[in-house]
Amino acid sequence: MTCVLKGCVNEGTVLGHETCSIGHANKLRKQVADMVGVTRRCAENNCGWFVCVIVNDFTFDVYNCCGRSHLEKCRKRIEARNREIWKQIERIRAERSFATVKKSRNSKPSKKKFKERKEFGTPKRFLRDDVPLGIDQLFAF
């Protein structure tokens, strides 16, 4: 099987992969990221790889990690960052509600607990702009 990277002339690829080397795999990810307009890199420190982008029929999914051996580290780091963000949001909301409680003595602060979001497991999904969905034909006169 030949390497799918544009301009590569190597005939042999690693079994189960689309490219001939690990460097060409990252270049392929860069080409796909440029094609869909994603400029983000992997969430792991000192990685430098482009994030995993999966192109579907009408959408493309963008993940936070490149999917190499440090996938679990990236997941934990992103979850920890999201927990810190939610703690800050809760603290700000508590301060705001405390400030409003001070002004009006009759109202009690709400005791809602905010659930943490886990953003890593699901990718962000975007619509592709290079595939016609047929919407323009609905409005054609």
UniProtKB/Swiss-Prot annotation:
Residues 102-115 have a biased composition (Basic residues). It holds the Pfam family DUF728. It comes from the Viruses. InterPro entries: Tobacco_rattle_virus_16kDa. Residues 100-119 are annotated as: Disordered. This is 16 kDa protein. It comes from Tobacco rattle virus (strain PLB).
